[in-house]
Amino acid sequence: MDRAHIQLYTDGACSGNPGPGGYGAILRCGSYEKVFSAGYATTTNNRMELLAVITGLEAIRWAQADVTVWSDSSYVVDAVEKGWVFSWEQKGFAKKANADLWQRFLAVYRRHQVRFVWVRGHNGHPENERCDRLAVAASQEKNLLVDVGYTKEA
């Protein structure tokens, strides 16, 4: 059986850092599209960028899909593509910001074949621009969620 080929577009936003934040994600497989967004009262831009990726990957129902993640976050893309997150994991995420989210990321990352593509933010990439609008709108909602993993050190 052929693997599903999925495109996952993501972005995070934060007004102040820390401050209210949100993420947006678009998951596409052929003509299927699912859109995700959520806002948090106090968080960071890096947490929202990473949570966008996690949320999209967790939504994939196909086993062992081929996933291309499009992100403007050097933090997320470099951590994976340069292998940093795997060395952080080997060291038990000691003193690493966002360890809760990186552990959650690795659990879902390993279910699929995932590659990351960095895109320049605010540069006219249609899906990145759409995810940015989703993230900003989510961060401005009235009833923002609590980012339970956020700490001032993160």
Language-model segment annotations:
Residues 22-29:
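Short beta-strand scaffold segments in enzyme catalytic cores
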